[in-house]
UniProtKB/Swiss-Prot annotation:
Segments for region (Interaction with TBX21): 1-258
Species this protein is from: Homo sapiens
UniProt comment concerning the protein's domains: Binds DNA via the 2 GATA-type zinc fingers. Each zinc finger may bind either adjacent sites in a palindromic motif, or a different DNA molecule allowing looping and long-range gene regulation.
Lineage: Eukaryota, Metazoa, Chordata, Craniata, Vertebrata
Pfam families registered for this protein in UniProt: GATA (PF00320)
Region: Disordered, residue numbers: 1-29, 128-180, 194-216, 361-389, 414-443
Protein name as catalogued: Trans-acting T-cell-specific transcription factor GATA-3
Amino acid sequence: MEVTADQPRWVSHHHPAVLNGQHPDTHHPGLSHSYMDAAQYPLPEEVDVLFNIDGQGNHVPPYYGNSVRATVQRYPPTHHGSQVCRPPLLHGSLPWLDGGKALGSHHTASPWNLSPFSKTSIHHGSPGPLSVYPPASSSSLSGGHASPHLFTFPPTPPKDVSPDPSLSTPGSAGSARQDEKECLKYQVPLPDSMKLESSHSRGSMTALGGASSSTHHPITTYPPYVPEYSSGLFPPSSLLGGSPTGFGCKSRPKARSSTGRECVNCGATSTPLWRRDGTGHYLCNACGLYHKMNGQNRPLIKPKRRLSAARRAGTSCANCQTTTTTLWRRNANGDPVCNACGLYYKLHNINRPLTMKKEGIQTRNRKMSSKSKKCKKVHDSLEDFPKNSSFNPAALSRHMSSLSHISPFSHSSHMLTTPTPMHPPSSLSFGPHHPSSMVTAMG
C-alpha cells in the first residue's frame, strides 16, 4: 500500500476506538459529538502499516509485535476517570462557557493535543487518553464528568471565576485539590430566599446538564453569593432607635412604680402622694403632712368617731353644762365642751368662768374686707347696666314697634333724621370734643 505524507497528520490524532472500528460513544458516554462517519474508518491492515511510519513518512521498525496488542498496551481504558481534570470552578449557572471555546482554551497548553507537524514519536508513554474528538459543551461535561464537583462547593467571588489554563494539565491535579479547599474560605451564609432561588437554579441546570448546549451568552452573570444589600449598606435598626419609628420623639420614661412601698409610720401601701421624712424613709401623704406641720409622728390611735346629731342630743358641756352649741369640742381630758368653753380654754389655758355663761348663742356680723366690698360694687353695677342701656328687651321692643309702620320700600327722611339710640347713656359715653379745644391743645 502506498503511503503519503499527509496521512499521519490525521491518523495520529484519532482515538484508538476509531482505528479499531468502534463507535466513540462506547468509550465516551458523556460525549455525544462525532466528526467521523463509520464509512471513513480505515481498515485494520492499513492501520498496521500506518503505525510504523514516522512523521516524515519513513518506515520504522515496530515496537510491538502485533498492532492490536500495541493499541491495547499504548491506550489504557477510557474509564480511568482519575486522569481527567475536573476543575471545581465550572459552575452550571455561569453562562460564559461557550461550547467548544471554553474547553478549547484549556487544551491549548495540554500535552494531550499533538501537532500535525510534531516530531514526537507516536509511541509515547502518556497514561492519559488522546483527545481526538472536539471538546464538548460545558453542559455535557457537567452532566458527564464534573457532576460530583459541580454543586458541592460554594460559589466563589467573580475575580476567582476566570478560567485558568493551568487547571487542565495533568500535573496540576494537586493544585486543583488545593483550590477546592480554598473554595471553602469563600463560603458565605445566604438568606433563605436566596437559598431557595439557588436550589431552583441548580435543579434546572442539572436537568439541562445531560443534553448538549452551545448557546452563547455574551453577558456574564454573577453567582448568587451576594447577601441582601439591606444588611450591609444600612445599619441595624437598633442603632437608629430600635424600630422604624425611632426617628420620632422618644417615649417618656414611666412613672415610678409605688409597688413595694410602705409608710414607715402607719404601714399604708396606697396613697395619692408619697413623702419622705428627715431620714429619707417613705411616708404616706397623711403622715407626711402631720410630721411637717407638728414636727412629730402622726399618732396611730384612730380618733373616736364623731357622734351624730341624734346621739349628741343628750350631750352637755362639762364646764357650763349647756346643751346647745354650734360646735362641740373636747378638753384636755377628752370630755365634750361647748364651743365657747373650748375656745376660751384654747386661748387662755384656763376654764371659762361660769359668770360668762349666756342663755343665747352670741353671733357676730363679720365685717367685709375692702376687697370683697369692691367686688360687690362691680357686681351690682354690672347688674344695673342692662336696665339703663338700650340693649334690654323692653327698649328693643319699643324701637321695633316704632319702625313697624314704615314701608320697607319707602325712603323716608325719618330714618335719617331720627337716629336710633344705640349707645348707652351719657354717663357711660364720651362727649364730643370741640375743635377749638384741639387747636388750643396743639397751640
